[in-house]
Regions:
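Sec-dependent N-terminal signal peptides
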Residues: 1-5
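Alpha-helical transmembrane segments and their helix-start/interface "positive-inside/aromatic belt" motifs
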Residues: 122-123, 182-187, 215-217
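Membrane-interface helix starts
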Residues: 144, 176-185, 280
């Protein structure tokens, strides 16, 4: 158990050391901002390690469409092989409006963005993690197809997954959505395990892990949009009536529709809160671990005693953060699924009107 916690911290330090040159350590000019944002950001290649002075990377396919020259498809390694530019495209330098993005130049010499559907690091990690999730779910489904319902309870990995699935289904979906939970269970279960798998893989400090998938706001935006569609597309008449004509005093609705406006605004703030909550928590966790690891290299020029002390402290804090991030990986998946289930359940709830009998 101790080795399982120490290993990620050690491998992360080794990975960051690839980005820090001996001259930077000696002069104490380690650019923490560049290292941190380089690791949590997206990229057109996947950096594995550095062998000697040679970075070992996986070049990824670049697929772009230019209004002037049409479609282009090539590996990102072609950019480096041709001095940073290939077929009129290059990576925008630091300080540019499109820093780190693939750009081309128009007839006036200005940088413009082509239609970019390239397979980036986050995209590849998303595909790998989705395939991993698919294999896990299909293996569980295969076991249940082969065994009748009255067979003995499964053990091992299948039993663990059954416990996990039943926990999410019974404790979150069924209790929050209500009687119509079966309609939404497939989406909510998928959302939970998708977020959980991506969170866990983001903590693995070597390929194919380490990509900051759920710390990418585009990913969390799509997840929140799915919940937004599920809530509003399947909302009952009562749900929409409570938005446009809520049960509040009439003077809060006419002549100024203050409460209807607030309720309508809430349609968009709920998924927005889901998006920001997941994005911010996962991004902050990755940044905290990277900054703690950078302390080792920042203190290299401060003498062996101070450097050794800070290294020990940094490793201990990293072990603590890795253990905490394991918990956060589960909690964030749980919270996102629970809030989505609550929002869906509120949109499904029918108000019961009690009629008192007169004697």
């Amino acid at each position: 158990m101790a080795m399982a916690l120490v290993l990620p911290a050690t491998l992360q330090a080794d990975e960051i050391s690839d980005d820090v040159t001996p001259a930077e350590q000696k002069e104490n000019t380690v650019d923490v901002k560049e290292i941190v944002f380089g690791h949590i950001g997206d990229s057109y290649e996947w950096h594995i390690t550095t062998w000697g002075n040679t970075p070992v990377t996986i070049p990824l396919p670049i697929i772009v469409y230019s209004n002037r020259t049409g479609w282009h498809t090539f590996l990102s390694s072609r950019l480096e092989e041709n001095g940073g530019s290939y077929e009129g495209f290059h990576i925008a330098p630091e300080g540019s409006k499109y820093e780190g993005k693939l750009v081309e130049q128009d007839v006036a010499g200005n940088e413009i963005r082509p239609l970019d559907i390239s397979i980036t690091k986050v995209t590849l990690a998303l595909l790998i993690n989705s395939m991993l999730l698919l294999v896990i779910i299909l293996s569980v489904a295969h076991w249940y197809r082969k065994h009748p319902q009255d067979s003995a309870a499964p053990g091992g990995f299948i039993g663990f997954m059954e416990m996990f699935i039943m926990m999410v289904n019974d404790d979150i979906i069924k209790s929050c959505v209500g009687p119509k939970y079966r309609k939404f269970a497939p989406y909510l279960l998928t959302a939970f395990f998708f977020i959980f798998i991506n969170n866990l893989m983001g903590l693995v400090p070597f390929f194919p892990g380490g990509a900051n998938v759920t710390g990418n706001i585009a990913i969390t935006m799509v997840l929140a949009l799915c919940t937004f569609v599920a809530v509003n597309l399947f909302g009952t008449k009562t749900y929409w009536k409570d938005i446009f004509w809520p049960d509040v005093p009439w003077w809060l609705k006419v002549p100024v529709p203050m409460m209807p406006f607030i309720e309508f605004f809430g349609i968009f703030t709920k998924p927005f809160a889901l998006m920001i909550r997941l994005f911010a928590n996962m991004l902050a966790g990755h940044m905290a671990m990277l900054v703690l690891t950078c302390l080792i290299f920042i203190s290299a020029s401060m003498g062996p005693v101070l450097n050794g002390s800070l290294t020990v402290a940094s490793v201990l804090f990293n072990i603590f953060m890795n253990a905490l991030e394991l918990l956060v990986a589960f909690i964030q998946a749980y919270v996102f699924t629970m809030l989505s289930a609550v929002f869906i359940g509120l949109a499904q709830e029918e108000h019961k009107v009690e009629v008192k009998k007169q004697h």
